[in-house]
Amino acid sequence: GDVYKRQIRNTLVLAVVATLIGCVIGLLCGILNTIPYTRQDPPVKRFFLKLLRALIRIYVEVFRGTPMVLQAVFIFYGLPYFTDGAVAFRGMSGIWAAAIIVVSINTGAYMAESVRGGIISIDPGQTEGAKAIGMTHFQTMTSVILPQAIRNILPQIGNNYIINVKDTSVMFIIGFTEFFASHRYICLLYTSPSPRDGLLPRM
């Protein structure tokens, strides 16, 4: 019982922390991805914003288009290999750090699109009205657009949290002991997986 309680706590803590960090990542990416530019803007600004949008698009497509278990393997095992040990996750604290990083950046990729969609769903007339009274883009975003956009995407934040609770089960591949991994280990210790016997206690 104590083992299950401890691992359920690990699962919930990982899901909460990673969801919060992922929301911050998604919020930043969503805002940066919707910064407007026109032909009248300096070429450097237009180039920088186009490059930024391209990098965000690559990030979103890669982490939304690949399984989380593959991302976990690459970050936990691949980064130490490719950096010749400069980046390494050692001990339980390292495993926790890797798990949080994996789930956070995965969540951030999904939240980036949710935030972008929430921002562009706001009536453009509100942005034009804010500019007409002399508000800067930053003031318009923080005072007019974001409060409405965040309210619209609150259900998606809840959905991502629920998904993260379930997806933490793939973190066993890097040694993270959450509820699913502990349950599987206990079943292997105390039950027989024989197709004939079913899951029966070992004699």
Regions found by a protein language model. Give the residues of each.
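Transmembrane alpha-helices and adjacent helix-loop boundaries
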Residues: 1-192, 196, 202
